[in-house]
Amino acid sequence: MTPDEARENTITYGILRSHDVDGSKGKKMRIRFDAMMSHDITYVGIIQTARASGLEEFPLPYAMTNCHNSLCAVGGTINEDDHVFGLSAAKKYGGIYVPANQAVIHQYAREMMVKCGNMILGSDSHTRYGSLGNMGVGEGGGELVKQLLKNTWDINAPEVVLVWLEGKPKKGVGPHDVAISLVKATFESGVVKNKVLEFAGPGVKELPIDFRNGIDIMTTETTCLSSIWITDEEVKHHYDIHERPQDFKELKPGDVAYYDMMIRIDLSSQEAMIALPFHPSNAVTIHELQADPVGILTRIEEDAKKRFGDKVDVHLVDKVVDGKVYADQGIIAGCSGGTYDNLAEAGAILKGKSIGNDYFTASAYPQSTPVSMAVTREGITADLIEAGVVMKPAFCGPCFGAGDVPSNNGLSIRHTTRNFPNREGSKPGQGQLSLVALMDARSIAATAANGGVITAATDVEYENTHKPYVYDEKIYKCRVYNGYGRPRPETELRYGPNIKDWPTMYAMQENMLLELAAVIHDPVTTTDELIPSGETSSYRSNPLKLSEFALSRRVPEYVGLSKEIQKQDLARRAGEVSANIAEALAKVGAKAEDTSFGSCVFANRPGDGSAREQAASCQKVLGGDANVCYEYATKRYRSNCINWGIVPFTIAKDVEFNFEPGDKLFVPGIREAILAGKEEIDAQIIARDGVKPIHLFFQNLTADERQILADGCLMNYYKNKK
């Protein structure tokens, strides 16, 4: 048996092949999903794009949750206007609508949408349900539009990584500890990028479902493509208590299965972890931090000063008092943190204790109303409230900057998914900087019980005597609208004044003249830097208004530069060629009528983090035509660029890119090259000190993706097909 044949015996390939419409078992896959998920930052844009492309009804179960800006009082009525639009769309097209604060997106999927052997596509990067036997994939809105129009998700057949679990976690160790260690071991090297993680081994049976879910949801931070786990009696129990026993089936690899690599995790030796600013991979054990707090926090301070310069004043080392590190805030929330088991453990640790009445504060967000009901009935809520923890509804806010923003220079410890720069909501342009460290709920509770002194839960005594989770679906039956299979086309969509159509986007011309509007040399550029989240996301349904925030926390000049470039291009299209364009084209011998003029972003490795398509669409709305980088951090960001007509150029790793905003890039014959199937092209940099050659790559584009780029964006592509 060859490796390729044996790879077909993995759980991963069993699921992927059953969803591949080609059925050829080749190196390319064209996937149709079983269901889809979106939240209120993304579903309006997806539906607007799909409507413009010919949508008639939802052809698969599509659940829309309202868990992101539901507590964010920004812009008057605009948040609830989007929610009302979502319900009207669910009625019109046959969707599933989950009202505000009923559940965070991924918990609703776990409770109501997953099935063993199925695949779910979500417009959120943390779409991961592998621990329940359901492969989840997070992509930008364009990929969901394709599914709504009965098209496919096209990928190269991925490599598969075996994650072998052994041993049993010690008391006080939680899922975030294991997950942070996994991210630390894999992110920087990119060793599992765009691969599927398949979890197996004797350690799996030692982990309850909430523990598995907590690890699984964080696999996104490794930059893997998706995940899947073996299923067992614990998974069967999950489906049984959720009244869906028919959706369980045993998943395991064949007798001989080939994996491209293996990661071995000894759960017994896992320590309590802390992921320091500004990435989940920037991790040490809590004991290591306790041993050298000044040295470690000094390095974080230096990193912050390098990132933000004199825009902010950082004093992280001030958190060390008498050799102990003091946090200002503790948060347990979202799809990773707000589980029943995490809250039960936190409640047990804090029972009879107090978080104190000093600067330290704590909040907990059960991840769904059924979980909230369960922790209330079991007395966990009472234990937490009596200790001083504020209980809040199901809401993703602390995970992306729309809830519990810390004070300036505040150190927040969080059981959430990310701690990227400013993701918690601080605004460096206004001199603000908060710092977030990721920890497991157990150690956050131990820290809270110790007055904010960062403490490992493995170092405290406690007994968790709470009963196992009991699920109650009554609330969903009362509140969730499920119209799948029953569209009501006569329903009028309800538009608030902030919900706007997409502006005109132009087809690619024969040549492309680009002006650099942002040049970023950070090792990684996150989607939160490309378009901030938090309160900014309230403007998600107004493309022009949202684009005003593009790169605002990283390159404040970007929007102004891009608008000026776009203004000149619109004038060129009307026959008025600016001196800026004319001078540049004269140096390369090109004509203005054949050459578009657009903005361009250079970054070393852009696109880590969120699947939000706005990271690309905002560039396009501002006249962006291309990105240039050494590599894209994630497939989903690159796909977002393509779907919005932004050419995803790369350059060779040994090429220095020492150019500045205002320098230009001329790409002759780009339209012909893309449509002819070429993968590289010679271009020219028009810099302040002369014209220089540069070689650009645009590899691994499908025929459809090439046409999307030529047409200018996905919407134009579908319009042209009608």
What kind of feature is each model-predicted range?
Residues 1-722:
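Fe-S-dependent hydro-lyases/dehydratases of central metabolism
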